[in-house]
């Protein structure tokens, strides 16, 4: 049955809200409720969130646990930061694939309040200030205009959860139908859309920077790629952005399981487009 995605800064009250939701649904629907979260993974969060690969592995483990628990009867609550829009999109693809309704509960706090609540925790449960600040800086707020962030319920510190509205969103709304893009999306690769967006942007900026000291005929090395750009002519920002959009659209429909190859694929695409 439905997936409830918690979202918010570290120490923003997500776990308390997840527990309130579990208690409500257990008492009022009789359904089994599963809370999946960072704590279940037995992690040292300061170590994990300081290392991008460890964090990526954590997201993959959480997504896999959600996928295992989603079924036609139970409610699953994912109690984690869920702060990357690409990861939320991947979870949206998962629920479309399994024909399951979902909603997002956004625990909205200020950075100062989250920092204050962090200091109130037991010492072994606190984030370091450096990690806390970094996560807040990287946070990508949900936007109800994005289908993967909708329905969206934004809850501030003193608000009560709108239980009935959340129930309506989960039980009276049809699950999103699968379509070609979600069938093609490689659900086994964590954060595919985020990586696609980031890597292609990095390649684009590397090309623009290298062109300042290059001339037609040069080979341009790109960080993260073994392939090189064959600079047959100069490319301006407008053209590069257009090519990047075209490549992203194509790759969404024809995804690769190996996200480490995205940079090489984009370089090859640019080389073909210049000839």
UniProtKB/Swiss-Prot annotation:
Organism domain of life: Eukaryota
GO MF terms, alphabetically ordered: ATP binding
GO terms of biological process kind: tRNA wobble uridine modification
Species name: Danio rerio
The entry's keywords: ATP-binding, Nucleotide-binding
InterPro entries: KTI12/PSTK, P-loop_NTPase
Pfam family, one: KTI12
Assigned protein family: Belongs to the KTI12 family.
Protein name in the entry: Protein KTI12 homolog
Binding site for ATP: 8-15
């Amino acid at each position: 049955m439905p997936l409830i995605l918690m979202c918010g800064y570290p120490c923003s009250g997500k776990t308390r809200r997840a527990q309130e939701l579990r208690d409500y649904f257990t008492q009022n629907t009789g359904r089994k409720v599963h809370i999946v979260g960072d704590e279940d993974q037995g992690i040292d969060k300061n170590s994990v969130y300081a290392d991008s690969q460890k964090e990526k592995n954590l997201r993959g483990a959480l997504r896999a646990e959600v996928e295992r628990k989603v079924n036609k009867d139970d409610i699953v609550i994912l109690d984690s930061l869920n702060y990357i829009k690409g990861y939320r999109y991947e979870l949206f693809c998962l629920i479309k694939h399994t024909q399951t309704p979902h909603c997002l509960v956004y625990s909205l706090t200020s950075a100062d309040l989250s920092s204050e609540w962090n200091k109130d925790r037991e010492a072994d449960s606190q984030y370091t200030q450096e990690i806390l600040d970094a996560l807040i800086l990287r946070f990508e707020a949900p936007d109800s205009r994005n289908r993967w962030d909708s329905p969206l319920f934004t809850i501030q510190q003193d608000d009560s959860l709108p239980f009935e509205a959340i129930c309506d969103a989960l039980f009276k709304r049809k699950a999103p139908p699968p379509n070609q893009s979600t069938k093609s999306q490689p659900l086994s690769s964590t954060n595919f859309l985020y990586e696609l967006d980031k890597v292609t942007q990095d390649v684009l900026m590397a090309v623009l920077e290298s062109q300042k000291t290059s001339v037609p005929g040069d080979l341009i090395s790109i960080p993260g790629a073994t392939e090189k750009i064959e600079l047959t002519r100069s490319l301006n920002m407008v053209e590069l952005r257009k090519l990047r959009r075209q490549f992203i659209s194509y790759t969404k429909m024809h995804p690769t399981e190996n996200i480490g190859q995205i940079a090489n694929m984009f370089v090859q695409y640019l080389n073909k487009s210049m000839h």
